[in-house]
């Protein structure tokens, strides 16, 4: 397993030229590695065995397992009644709906002296049935949502996501990787051409002077439109990151059939150590044992229903993976949203842009920084910020000093020492 995941670690290594900021890197690179690791972990049969294992009296067990894996399994729906809903249902009314199965239970069920209204077309809770029938209660002990079905009383909940988990994770990894791939194409190795060979702390004098003259010439040349498009494309990729995080939260909600709305209520039970409710909510989406119905036809064409019990070992891991991914996507959406707000503030405020450049400089006054940035557009500023994190700090300070002197000589004013 480690040998399969090890190549992904190279994707997290820092490059000599950084074309993404920290939020972009976490969003596109770290998330992709997490998703690919989860998909590899789920596909490792040596740890979890086959994705489904069924128990049956039939000899052709492999056929049954393949059928249940292909057609899907189900559990009996567990209704989560509140106190008010439970007060509306009496034992006698529940038992009367299935007299054949509850013939022995109706004589022992407690009688209610008060008149209770019932809703039409009422479908009873699986747990409520078990409270008034001992045999059915024993069957419920197999697993949550696994027991005999009662016509008109129980409802099936199909686990349609189980076969698609690995495919979903691979698709999500591609979606999260797309903005970084798009920006890498749009960036066109511009920063590498500007900042190569000058990112180290120690530079030869010849390289230092050559690169300094090249950067001064570049930022004194009018590339206003090109730099604005450069910045606009990067901001578009940041917006894409935010939208992808939000959409993936919604996708998980739909994919898991509204689990997260229930899961938030389950979190409230942790301070009270209500693990029974926690287990019920978790088992309604990630059951470890489920039912599977296989049709077997006789010689005359009569269909016989084979009720099989299936173990879903991958749900042990699916439960942890999706809980983590939901929290991770929420964190990514929050970070991307805050990053966009900061980007908007930088675009609207020249003062903030000057302060950001000044934070990269030491021993340079605010007035000199302001003069060096006087003729630079917002696109020029954006590219200069990218250059500042990829070059030697001393080289960047000398670049700003050169620009300040050029602006001063062009205006005909005198320049005081920046220190």
UniProtKB/Swiss-Prot annotation:
One of its GO terms (biological process) is monoatomic ion transmembrane transport. The chain crosses the membrane at residues 22-42, 163-183, 239-259, 321-341. It is found in: Cell membrane; Cell junction, Gap junction. It is a multi-pass membrane protein. GO terms for cellular component: gap junction; membrane; plasma membrane. It comes from the Eukaryota. It holds the Pfam family Innexin. Residues 43-162, 260-320 are extracellular. Expressed in the cortex of the pupal CNS and at low levels in the wing imaginal disk. InterPro entries: Innexin. The keyword Ion transport applies. Keywords: Cell junction, Cell membrane, Gap junction, Ion channel, Ion transport, Membrane, Transmembrane, Transmembrane helix, Transport. Residues 1-21, 184-238, 342-419 are cytoplasmic. One of its GO terms (molecular function) is gap junction channel activity. Its main location: membrane. Belongs to the pannexin family. Structural component of the gap junctions. This is Innexin inx5. The lineage of its organism: Eukaryota, Metazoa, Ecdysozoa, Arthropoda, Hexapoda.
